[in-house]
A protein has these predicted regions:
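Phosphate-/nucleic-acid-contacting segments
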Residues: 144-187
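Short phosphate-coordinating micro-motif centered on Lys-Gly-acidic
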Residues: 37-42
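Short, Lys/Arg-enriched N-terminal segment that forms or immediately precedes the first helix
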Residues: 130-139
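Cyclic-nucleotide recognition modules
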Residues: 67-125
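Cyclic nucleotide-binding regulatory module and flanking cytosolic helices
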Residues: 1-27
Length: 187
């Protein structure tokens, strides 16, 4: 749990009492590679912190597997739209490497907001950051070429090529594997 609380400190400090409250609604789980942490059609009720390993969010469009995002160690992953609306998600969270994950019960977490305003502030800041990342991702698709998106990905996550199957990287970039190979060989 210490890694989780270190991550939280990047956003907002918590009192020891607030940390204990979060620890009380969290559990550490081990997930095997290629397992869906949350399946398509599931209503999200858990916020996950990746202690070790790697996850991706994906969905199917016209029968094609599309990768929306990757989440590396020391970061949060959840289906936020499902979490806040209470509706089943059309996307899944898949573990790409054996992973140790902290699962935070979101229903219980939200109940802590009134008692611990610092927890509410913490998660507001985390969700704001996730929103900004989403906007940046959308703008990357709208305004940048595939090669520029690839360079940005390598700059932000240099290990992605070593750790993620190229079909998922290509899908994330919105290109075919052949196009990704061309971009990589032109370097």
């Amino acid at each position: 749990m210490q890694t989780l609380f270190k991550f939280f400190k990047k956003y907002n400090s918590l009192s020891l009492e607030a940390e204990k409250a979060i620890a009380g609604i969290s559990k550490i789980i081990h997930i095997k590679k290629n397992t869906d942490l949350q399946a398509i059609g599931h209503t999200c009720k858990t916020i996950y912190f990746i202690n070790s390993g790697l996850a991706r969010i994906y969905y199917f469009k016209d029968g094609t597997d599309i990768t929306e995002s990757f989440t590396f160690e020391n970061n949060i992953v959840a289906r936020i739209e499902s979490l806040f609306t209470g509706k089943p998600s059309r996307k899944a969270i898949q573990i790409l490497e054996d992973a140790d994950v902290v699962a935070i019960n979101a229903t219980q977490l939200f109940k802590l907001y009134n008692k611990y305003p610092e927890i509410e502030r913490l998660f507001r800041l985390i969700f704001e950051s996730a929103y900004v990342d989403t906007v940046n991702r959308i703008e990357g698709i709208q305004f940048h070429t595939a090669e520029e998106r690839y360079k940005t990905l390598i700059k932000e996550a240099p290990d992605v090529i070593k750790r993620v199957p190229l079909k998922y990287v290509a899908s994330y970039l919105g290109i075919t594997q052949v196009s990704l190979s061309r971009i990589r060989s032109s370097k």
